[in-house]
Amino acid sequence: MSEIKVGENETIESALRRFKRKCARAGVLSEVRKREHYEKPSVKRKKKSEAARKRKFK
């Protein structure tokens, strides 16, 4: 879990900005989106191979 300490003279806006940046770097939102719906292992493999194919031909 990402957490920050708010300084004495720090505004809530800047603390919130730091928290959002820390969450983005940790990949929290992408992980939530990925786990939002169950994905069968066969579908995961298919997506992974299609992504590899796109990278190869790009």
Curated annotation (Swiss-Prot):
Originating organism: Clostridium kluyveri (strain ATCC 8527 / DSM 555 / NBRC 12016 / NCIMB 10680 / K1)
Bias (Basic residues) ranges: 43-58
GO biological process: translation
Presence of keyword Ligase: no
NCBIfam families: S21p
Gene Ontology MF terms in the entry: structural constituent of ribosome
Keywords assigned by UniProt, alphabetized: Ribonucleoprotein, Ribosomal protein
Gene Ontology annotations for the cellular component aspect, listed alphabetically: ribonucleoprotein complex; ribosome
Pfam families attached to this UniProt entry: Ribosomal_S21 (PF01165)
Keyword set includes Nucleotidyltransferase: no
Domain of life, per lineage: Bacteria
Entry's transmembrane regions: none
Name recorded for this polypeptide: Small ribosomal subunit protein bS21
Family (UniProt): Belongs to the bacterial ribosomal protein bS21 family.
